[in-house]
């Protein structure tokens, strides 16, 4: 059985799909929290946020922003909630990453509130350290990959410049 988003892609119905390209889909689903709710999701099946490649995630975010502006203008919304339910613990119902843009109006009866909990100082510090250490490990890998990519781009750039210089020099040599 396919996921709901993959079925939308497969059906390719125009009333459901607002926008699509080779990487991302913007669609209205059958069951929504509010009239005009729109979902932005990658065409390729990625279950959670952490699985989505950065360039696709960036495109999803840009489209979610544009859809939000269209909801404000087209539906005269007074606000929007932009929601990502990431994983079972976050009550993700569809096993496919998506960004929900929910139009809001004052007094619409939609309750997305939760009770904040006060953390103890030691809990806060332990949480901060654990997240920072994990992030630093990931950043070291990311920075290494970025540096390697920059080196490759630099080498390509030098070759292109060299090729261009040779072309210009050859052209100049032909002048009488």
Feature-to-residue mapping (PLM):
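HIT superfamily nucleotide-processing domains
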Residues: 1-176
